[in-house]
């Protein structure tokens, strides 16, 4: 049952208060220690923020995707690692669920929604992109797959309990033969290496993974052989790209807030910056940029809810547009602050670093353009 408007507004107000209050305390701790405190995971789980988009009969809040995005905009105004936790936990259950058996749903989906297990989306490889050129492979022997290969840049790959991992049957090419597997981190033949710290999104762990004939039960495969990329692309990446687009909107909104606040109080030559047309016009451009990206993102979400086949392409359009918008907005926001904005612990300095990561998350701008171009040129034929 959809949440009514009054209850939704109450929830949104609660989340905004959390983001601007305790969320900022967590942000300061993360920036100081370069680690996400375990208490943040517990707090987000106990508040129900890690299961907002999951159905009520799964233990979630049952919020429809387009409304959930309005909440994601709020979370994105906080520290990027806080936003990342909410984003990943509200997305991975859906990728697992679409082709899960009842047994798999009980073993993986419901515990993940409840916050009892953590699952990392495990697609990217050192020598492959983010699609059908997977090189990690499995050999089937009876009721067991033996997994060999490498993965890297895996968000929460160090601390997860399971990897939702994509590989291919030995000897296959393209999307044929791809499989989606739930791999237990305690399986034999696994080496986990934490990657060096990133420029932004401090505190979020990323892993390099090596699998050397790691046994995975066939019962841990989602769907059939050949459906691996269906799980990855349709079940996760389309919605995740839309969610990342809205994350860009939220982060840009916070950057704009900081720029406006600074412009109203900072004086030069007897005038506040806001009284100078060059500054006022930059802020006006930001406002229009943010709203345009917000509306395209919501449009993509609603088309996905309507089962429109164009939703995949629209998700790439939304992500491309929102990322480019965020780049412009954060650059202007930092410029409004002047040199002082370049120093820690000014919040705009952190936002500027965090914003750059969005150009990579869930596919680079070049990948999004490739997806869009294939669609429009294919349609033209």
Regions found by a protein language model. Give the residues of each.
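Amphipathic, small/basic residue-rich leader segments at the start of a protein or domain
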Residues: 1-87, 98, 106-111, 328, ...
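A short core secondary-structure module
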Residues: 144, 148-192
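Glycine-rich phosphate/cofactor-binding loops in nucleotide/flavin-utilizing enzymes
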Residues: 70, 91, 337-381
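A structural signal for short hydrophobic beta-strand segments in well-ordered beta-sheet cores
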Residues: 136-139
């Amino acid at each position: 049952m959809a949440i009514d408007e009054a209850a939704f507004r109450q929830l949104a107000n609660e989340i905004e208060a959390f983001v601007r209050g305790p969320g900022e305390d967590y942000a300061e701790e993360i920036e100081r220690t370069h680690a996400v405190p375990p208490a943040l995971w517990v707090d987000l789980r106990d508040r129900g923020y890690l299961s907002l988009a999951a159905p009520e009969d799964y233990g979630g809040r049952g919020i429809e995707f387009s409304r959930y995005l309005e909440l994601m905009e709020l979370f994105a105004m906080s520290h990027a690692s806080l936003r990342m936790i909410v984003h990943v936990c509200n997305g991975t259950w859906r990728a697992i669920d679409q082709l899960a058996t009842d047994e798999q749903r009980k073993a993986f989906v419901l515990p993940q929604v409840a916050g009892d297990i953590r699952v990392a989306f495990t697609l990217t490889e050192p020598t492959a992109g983010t699609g059908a050129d997977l090189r990690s492979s499995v050999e089937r022997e009876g009721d067991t797959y033996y997994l060999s290969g490498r993965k890297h840049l895996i968000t929460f790959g160090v601390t997860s309990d399971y990897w939702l991992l994509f590989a291919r049957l030995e000897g296959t090419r393209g999307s044929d033969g791809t499989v989606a597997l739930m791999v237990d981190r305690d399986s034999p033949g696994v080496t986990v290496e934490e990657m060096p710290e990133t420029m932004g999104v401090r505190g979020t762990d990323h892993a390099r993974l090596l699998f050397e004939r790691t046994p995975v039960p066939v019962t841990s495969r989602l769907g059939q052989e050949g459906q691996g990329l269906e799980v990855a692309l349709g079940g996760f990446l389309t919605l995740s790209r839309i969610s990342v687009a809205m994350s860009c909107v939220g982060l840009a909104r916070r950057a704009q807030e900081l720029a406006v606040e600074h412009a109203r109080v900072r004086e030069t030559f007897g005038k506040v910056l806001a009284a100078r047309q060059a500054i006022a016009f930059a802020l006006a451009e930001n406002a229009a940029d943010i709203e345009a990206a917000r509306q395209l993102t919501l449009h993509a979400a609603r088309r996905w809810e309507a089962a429109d086949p164009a939703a995949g392409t629209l998700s790439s359009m939304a992500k491309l547009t929102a990322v480019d918008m965020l780049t412009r907005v954060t650059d202007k926001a930092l410029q409004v602050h002047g040199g002082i904005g370049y120093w820690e612990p000014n919040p705009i300095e952190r936002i500027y670093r965090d914003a750059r990561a969005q150009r990579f998350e869930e596919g680079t701008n070049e990948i999004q353009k490739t997806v869009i171009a294939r669609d429009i040129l294919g349609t033209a034929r």
